[in-house]
Swiss-Prot record:
This is Major allergen Alt a 1. It is found in: Spore wall; Secreted. One of its GO terms (cellular component) is extracellular region. Residues 35-153 form the AA1-like domain. It comes from Alternaria alternata. Belongs to the ALTA1 family. Disulfide bonds join 74-89, 128-140. The lineage of its organism: Eukaryota, Fungi, Dikarya, Ascomycota, Pezizomycotina.
Length: 157
């Protein structure tokens, strides 16, 4: 019986040793569309967290990737910017945004007409550092560009 047990252990060890280990493919990334008629580049993210937990101002640049002229800064300021709330990108822009600070998630909405509204979303990676207006004051800055693809918002049924 001991021989059978020992032989089984050696056989299992031999099978385990025969299977080559491969390193995980950490450098592989999903392809991201970076240009097109409905693709916009989001860059230059900035924000301020006066108490370290919420934003009171944030903004980012939106630029067309198809050679178009769209290139402007979208921003909002308030005593406390609320998550899950729409803020206008500016007068006559027909664009609004919402930002989820816990995941750095941007939701953008463009009203094209009464019948057509486009939406898009992206994660805006950023880094926050001491802001200088107190121990809990943080200034945040984007660390990478993001690209969004506008899709038509379905009508409610």
């Amino acid at each position: 019986m001991q021989f059978t047990t020992i032989a089984s252990l050696f056989a299992a060890a031999g099978l385990a040793a025969a299977a080559p280990l491969e390193s995980r493919q950490d450098t592989a990334s999903c392809p991201v569309t970076t240009e097109g008629d409905y693709v916009w580049k989001i860059s230059e993210f900035y924000g301020r967290k006066p108490e370290g937990t919420y934003y009171n101002s944030l903004g980012f640049n939106i630029k067309a990737t198809n050679g178009g002229t769209l290139d402007f800064t979208c921003s909002a300021q308030a005593d406390k910017l609320e998550d899950h709330k729409w803020y206008s990108c500016g007068e006559n822009s027909f664009m609004d945004f919402s930002f989820d600070s816990d995941r750095s998630g941007l939701l953008l909405k463009q009203k094209v007409s009464d019948d057509i509204t486009y939406v898009a979303t992206a994660t805006l990676p950023n880094y926050c550092r001491a802001g200088g207006n107190g121990p809990k004051d943080f200034v945040c800055q984007g660390v990478a560009d993001a690209y969004i693809t506008l899709v038509t918002l379905p009508k409610s049924s």
